[in-house]
Amino acid sequence: MARNSVLLGGIFTAWLGAGPALAADLTMAVRTEPSSIDPHFHVYVPNGATAKHVFDALISAGPRGEQMPGLSDRWKVVADDVWEFHLRQGVRFHDGVTFTADDVAFTLARAPVVPNSPSSYSQYTKQIASVEVINPETIRIHTKGPAPGLLWDLMQISIIARHAADGRSTADFNAGRAAIGTGPYRFVSWQPGDRLRMTANPEYWGGVEPWANLTIRPIANDGARVAAMLAGDVDMIEGVPSSDRARLLADPKLALWETDAFRIIYIVMDSARDASPGIADAAGKPMDKNPLRDARVRRAINLAINRPALIDRLLGGQAHAAGQYVPSDNPGASPNLKPSPYDPDGAKRLLAEASWPDGFSVTMASSNDRFPQDAQVAQAVGQMLARIGVKVNVTPMPASQLFSRGSKLEFSMMLSGWVGNGDPASPLTALMATYDPKTGMGPSNRGRWSNAGFDAALGEALQTLDEGKRNALFGRAADIAVADMGVIPVYFTINSWATRKGLKYEGRGDEMSLAMGVKPVK
C-alpha cells in the first residue's frame, strides 16, 4: 500500500529539471488552522504541524515515521525500565537562552496536565514513572516497566523552555509570550481565522531554512484553496480535492505530491451510556434506551457502509478501505482482518436479532473542514444507514468544535479521523483503550467503549520488548476491537499537496504540511 510520489502531467516520475529562482517568502494554505500555539494543548495534526516549526522534540519524525535524532543526538537503554538521552550541545532557544536537560524535565511534567485539553498528551507520557536530570546535557527517563514504544511517544512531545513557559498558560503561547522554542522558525504572530506568521531562525542547529518569512493561511473551503493556488496567491496547498486533481495535474505551472497516510477515518459510537443524547426511535421520539450499547447494532452499522462506493464515487479513488486501525501491511496489523463487505441484508438481520427490526434514529456529528470531503462522507454514510432503517441526522461542524464537544460526550455518533505515527499503539491507545485520565489511556475514546480483553492485550503489548510478540499482541487487540466493533474502521486517506512549479515537497504519512519539507528545485 505504501506510496510516495510526485505527479507531473498525470504520470509518476522523479522530479527533474530546474525551476525559477525563489523569493525569500513562503505562503502555505492549509485546510484547518491550529486550535492553539501551545504544543501540549491538543493532540491534533494542525497543532502538531505548527509546533514542529517553532519547537523540536527529543526524537525527530521522518516523513514515514522514521525515528531520527532531534534534541537528543544519541540514547541508550540502561535497564529494561531506564532510558538515557544525551542532549545536543550548542542549542539555544529563540531568545538566546541555552537549552538544557532541565527544559526536558519541565516539558515532560507539563505536557500531560495542560488544562482543558480536548485530547491530552498524557497518552504519550503514560509510561513515564519519573525523569532524572543527570547533568545539563544528560537525562534519564524511568518507565513503569519495559517501554518499547517510548521513542514513538517522545517523537510527539515538543520541548519548551522552562524560563519562558513556567507559570504561563495556553493563552500566553497563543499570544507569543511563551512560544519560544529551538525550532527552525520563530513565532511572529497569530491571527486566528486569518494567518500565522513566522520568520526563519538564523541560528537553527539543523541549518537555516531557505524561507526568510513563512505565512500559513487557513482556507477551509476546498474550492477557495484551489483557487488561491491557481491564482498564485499561495505557494502550496494541502488537501487537493479529488474533483480538482485532474485540473491541477494538467496545469504546467503546478506539481502534485501524494503519499499514503497514517490517517484512519472511523466512526465512534456511544457504547457506554444507557441513554444517549442523540438517540430516538424510528419515529423520531427520544428514547431512554441506547441501541448502540449492543455489539450487534454496531456490527450492523459497519455492514451497512459501502466502502468501495465511498472511495470510488466520492473520493475519486484517493483512499483505501479499512478493516482495522492500521494499514494491513503495517507491522502490528492483524492478518485476520479485511475490510468488511457491504451487506445491508446482513445488517438488517443483526438489527432484528438485537430487537431493533424497525431501526432507530441517531445524530452523527462530523467535521466539515478537517479531511477531504469529510461532511460529504458523513452525509453519504447517513444515506447508507437509512437503507437498513437507521435514520441519521448528520451534523457537520468545524473540527475544533467537533473535538471539544466530542470530548464532553455530547454526541451519540461521530465520524472522525486519527493520524497515527506508524506505531499501532497510537490508534489503539488513543481511540479504544478504556478511558482513564490517571493513566493517560483512551484520551480520544469519545464513545467510552471498554473491553477487558482488549485492554489486557494492548497493555501487554506496550510492555513487550520482543518485536514479534509485541506486534502479535497488537494484532490480537485489533481482532477483539473489530469483533466487538468498538470503533468502526472506514478507510485510510491518501495525502496530497500541490506546489507551484520550482518547488518540491516531501509528502508525509502524518499529513503535516511543513515548510521544512518545501525546497527549491535545483
Predicted regions and their residues:
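Extracytoplasmic/periplasmic ligand-capture domains
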Residues: 60-63, 88-119, 130-132, 179, ...
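Surface-exposed binding/hinge segments that line
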Residues: 76, 121-165
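Sec/Tat signal peptide C-region and signal peptidase I cleavage site
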Residues: 19-23
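Long beta-strand-rich cores associated with HINT superfamily self-processing modules
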Residues: 350, 497-522
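Bacterial N-terminal signal peptides that target proteins for export
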Residues: 1-8
